[in-house]
Amino acid sequence: MFPYKYLTELPQVALLSKQVGGAATATLPNTLMSAFTRLDVKSLQLDAIYPLEHNGGGMFAIGNRALIVSKRGKFFLYDSDDAANVRDLDISVNINYQEFLSFVNSKGLDDKIVQNWFRFIDVLYHEDSSGKSLLLSHYYWHAQDECFTVRISRLNVPEDGELENVSATTDDWNTVYDTKPCLKIKPKGFYFAGHFSGGRMEFLKEDELLFTVGFLGFDGNASDYFYSQGTDGDYGKILKLDLQTGQATDFTIGQRNPQGLTIDSKGRIWSTEHGPQGGDELNLIEQGANYGWPYVTYGTDYGTTRWPLSESQGRHDGYRLPIFSWVPSIGVSNLIEIQGFLPEWEGDLLVTSMKQQTLFRMRYREGRVVFVEPIKIDLRIRDIDQLDNGNIILWTDKTWIIELTPGENFITPDIADFVRELEEPEKQQAINAIHSCHVCHSAAPGGVIETAPSLWGVFDRKIAGSRFRHYSPALRSKQGHWNEETLNLWLEDSNGFAKGTSMAYPGIANPAIRKAVIDYLKALQ
């Protein structure tokens, strides 16, 4: 009936809030709107309860619970059935963070780079024939050799033990794999480009793990050398690890910073990857494929309009093409395939982003993406997973845990009900007038988009009284509410009603058509 192009939010009434130190935590909206679908929200901000740093860590769903590791390696267990009480787990891991800080300070380097990017990346909980274990990806500083790697560590969980009761010290972890070679700090560009980590893990089968590794700033542009196209290093690739032998082989090459990885119900492997300034990618991963970095990209070097290593700018010629690319970049992070959430969403991919602070629902059919629906969250989304109850759970850079559930959908009134008493051509003119409203305005509950406020609930609402941020001064200066009288004046002559309004239009001269539009607006409740 009308275009839904943007996510919308209801007023900010939180489902969850905690008293911490005598003050309530911040809250998030308790409802979001996607296209024709209301999403209910449960949310909790961990750093209002525990002292945590922002921008890092990962999450893994276990039944209706989620295991979370923070940027600095603190573990938490979130339970969908008891969402207000997150368990702090007694698990410690050493990555030699303080030693790396001391090293860069001794060299007179800016240690904020280490503080920001030397962190924990991803976590998996795994059960197989050999037992239960936690797998963790993170940076590790090799103090004796003065170099760093991306490491996978493993913690065996007692067979009869519950995860919330596990206690582990740094000595209880085993090293599964360290990326090769161990990297010295760079003399060019960022000395430690830790924001290009990759680090995502996904089981291919019981003893085989896929592991994404970012290029760590070694791209032949901000460095004199790169590893992503050679055989002498792991960086800029997706590796296949044999967990029995600890050996790694290149599964794919030519990646830049693959921060998302999932295997869908058909066995297809999907990865999301950061491009440079533009060119974030959704890739369908096939063993042995070369995805082209750093020779090709749909992005450019930062602050320029070109990527210096590309012979053909912006073409991605000669290498495996992405299934989809975002230009400009969205700051892509992880992704999942949606199963058992909503019938309308079944089998779609849900891609998260940091820069755009948005979920992207993507439908892949017959070899192509047929649509992409943005769902604005307004927080940097670091990770995503789906619980056994079907709910979608997000981990954000500001330590919010957000759980999304399908809500009861609103019903849009049938336009035909409001034009029955009109004769042609007035009937069609009234239908056209109502449709023209929805060229700019949403009719979703609480809908707030960039172009115009939602019409839902407009009747009896204060004039210029919604959460829309871009009302004209002319409309903001008006007193009163939208009722039959004020709506009639507005529809007849908007500029006469609010001189200087940014929404001046010719108006509707026919009072019968104006009445049909007003009756329709009254029904949007």
Short names for language-model regions:
Residues 368-389:
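Conserved blade-ending motifs and adjacent loop-strand segments that build the rim/top face
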Residues 445-484, 505-507:
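Gly/Gly-Pro-rich "capping" loops immediately C-terminal to redox-active cysteine motifs
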Residues 6-215, 268, 328-367, 387-404:
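Acidic, Gly/Ser/Thr-rich repeat motifs that build Ca2+-stabilized beta-propeller blades
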Residues 15-39, 86, 110-113, 118-120, ...:
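Beta-propeller domain segments
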Residues 418-450, 455-456:
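Sequence/structural segment immediately N-terminal to covalent heme-attachment motifs in c-type
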Residues 1-3:
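Hydrophobic membrane-insertion alpha-helices, especially the h-region
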Residues 390-392, 406-410, 481-525:
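C-terminal capping alpha-helices of c-type cytochrome domains
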